[in-house]
């Protein structure tokens, strides 16, 4: 199924993807999702926050269901598997169950959460954060992309109703359990399929380094107030201090004003991604780097530990050759973490990534491992929903 969408939002020069939320590529992917649901006779709809749902069964009659799926948006120049693998595998797992004549005792849904990556508006997992009430709807509406368009304006242009954004208890009540399949984003998984134990705490911060614009040639060094130097020191310190604290820190995005080759900048704005196994160490790192800059926390996701009973059960069901699937933590953020923090029983399946490359065109998973992921997911869905042939 991934072949159906492999050209949507793809850069023909690099092979990477640009699938920003609510872009033309995203709208095309939404149509693909709805079409896949209709092909299978699933009842699909878009909730008030832009998340997509496709139901096998009726949760309003049968009670809360088991939801699987992921997201379809990407980071800039992202890979083909991060997100779409989970959505495609969810549809294929349903196909596998139906092919075996399986009839679940509770509803099953495929979900596609909007703007998981946060590439356009700067906040990750916007759809699931709004759904669960973690993200204030007024703040969400005011978020702006690089062109200055607010989320409110973008949603209105797409025919949505931004005034309806916010916690959606009606939709949440339909979700009894959530199981997200995702490509592993490192090299820690040696088996074809694994299970997540926890998600590291992580956040994004905007650093504003201020200076004074001036001529690059005529301004003596002793007369300069150059914010680029402060930024450069922060980049080096981020690496040094992160290693000392045992965490990860990355300045991956930067904006310079006025951005002239022959002028000292007046402002350097950079975005820091920091994450690690312990909250205190991540926050200590950010505090140490904050000297000389105005720092704004744009998002924060606390540590998530997945339900031990559920993850153990999932590992046993998803294992191959009679052995439980390996259980491992992840440093990557996911919608599964947002739902788990909101009290939804949640588990994650990982599909092996042989290179460990992610958020880049080189992201990859072997076809046979993807098949193993579908088989494992189908087994988990069958186990958690009961029913039979």
Question: What kind of region is each of these model predictions?
Answer:
Residues 1-23, 114, 140, 297, ...:
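N-terminal capping segment at the start of a domain
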Residues 4-6, 69-70, 325-375, 379, ...:
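Zn-dependent metallopeptidase/amidohydrolase metal-coordination segment
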Residues 7-8, 149-197, 235-239, 300-352:
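Active-site-adjacent substrate-binding region
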Residues 10-57:
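A non-catalytic alpha/beta surface segment that caps or lines the substrate-entry region
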Residues 18-22, 250-260, 270-277, 294-311, ...:
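A short beta-alpha structural unit
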Residues 76-147:
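A generic, well-ordered mixed alpha/beta core segment in the N-terminal half of proteins
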Residues 115-116, 122-280:
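Midchain, well-structured core segments that form catalytic/ion-binding scaffolds
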Residues 215, 219-244, 351-389:
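His/Asp/Glu-rich mid-to-C-terminal helical/loop segments that flank catalytic regions of hydrolases
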